[in-house]
């Protein structure tokens, strides 16, 4: 694969794996190459184990053409449960695992539960920081910025959407073409017939509705990978949002928060939106990305198997974890009494082996 010898390909991929993908069908013992998918796409997993120090939000699938030019695939992501970089393609050629360091680095996301998801959204140009070095992960996401992120993910041409119907969306605002696009496409309707409230924070049930509309209008069929959950605050979800919340939860794109609450009227934070964008990309490529280890929208870990939250003891890769018998949330960082015996769990949730306690 001479193309991989280019300076650009070496800089993007380094020593990470590369694959020359092809598709064939077998008939009568004879292999026939399939060169054209006729406008359809196929989901691909590139197996990969991140190197020490690599942040998974910065991992991409990259396409290398015959001249050695690299295309970074925005709609690709590393999924830890699948242990692979996932993406969709409509053609077969040379692909590899690339790494793009986001510069400048955000100084306010270190240790944040959504740090990798924030890097995913920022490195792909879906979300910007609130300054050159800050992301403000726990502040609210405005409606204008949210729709802008969706437009960027869809890859629209802003020049094609310079006029719109909302009187409170100024033509020179950065979000104007994206709001116009979303309205013309039927993804958003506005808070009234003529206003959008672009600078107002979006709440979680509004986010669910817009995401469901986005998927439908762009032709994505949302899977029902996870078992439906009845949230503790289900009665607080507006009637017009209930179906969207259920669809997003079952697909694995939106999750609850602590105490099994959805918090429908709560403001969607910038960290939550970054997380939703990453989940969406992974889920529409490979619905099974919703199984395995998953964080809820407060950053707590659960483990899903065949669409259901595992509860009690979990053995995974020769390590033991304790998942609450009611909520399924992983216990981490300290002593825990289980069935009359004491166990110690590290900060990553793994049980300390050979633990002896005289409590």
Protein language model regions, located:
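Short, ordered beta-strand-loop transition motifs
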Residues: 11-17, 26-28, 76-84, 130-131, ...
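Generic recognition of long tandem-repeat/solenoid scaffolds
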Residues: 21, 31-35, 82-90, 135, ...
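Extracellular adhesion/carbohydrate-binding repeat motifs centered on closely spaced tryptophans
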Residues: 78, 82, 285-359
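Feature responds to low-complexity, polar/acidic, surface-exposed segments characteristic
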Residues: 90-115, 123, 128-144, 151-177, ...
